[in-house]
Amino acid sequence: MSNFAVAITFKLLTIMMKENTVKIFEQSFKDNWDRPCLTDYNTKETITYADFARDIAKIHLFYKEIGIQEGDHVAIIGKNNPTWVTLFLATITYGAVIVPILQDFNPNDAQHIVNHSEAKLLFASKSNWERLDFENMRMVRAALSLDDCTLYEQKEEEVVADVL
């Protein structure tokens, strides 16, 4: 099989996987709209599938507003929580690439992963954010809180609108 045929086959498989994955989630949301979806065991707050779907849609709009495109990388570092899960699923269903970074990595390693991945956007928990050096993240245009999606810092004025 030629390199061209392999590339076309891979592209078709990628498209089919994305379409099928999105369809599975869409059907799950429809079937369970009013049922509990995610629970934060620290706060005991539970969100429904409807809330989850709306949050994913808001993140998609946010990505579009700030110019994130399919294939762009979005990094996330912090403890797993409902926001982490929502960002993860929103990113992959948008067509961007999620770069999950273990919260326990030392700051130099975490920063290296962000830079090496060429992430354009970073979501970080407060404790992780305080240990990172935003100015040395070459490609990251904006960094937001993993806890409440508020803006920590951005490189250009007006990059991040109040979409979230």
Specify the residue positions occupied by each region the protein language model found:
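N-terminal non-cleavable signal-anchor helices
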Residues: 6-7, 141, 160, 164
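AMP-dependent adenylate-forming
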Residues: 24-48, 164
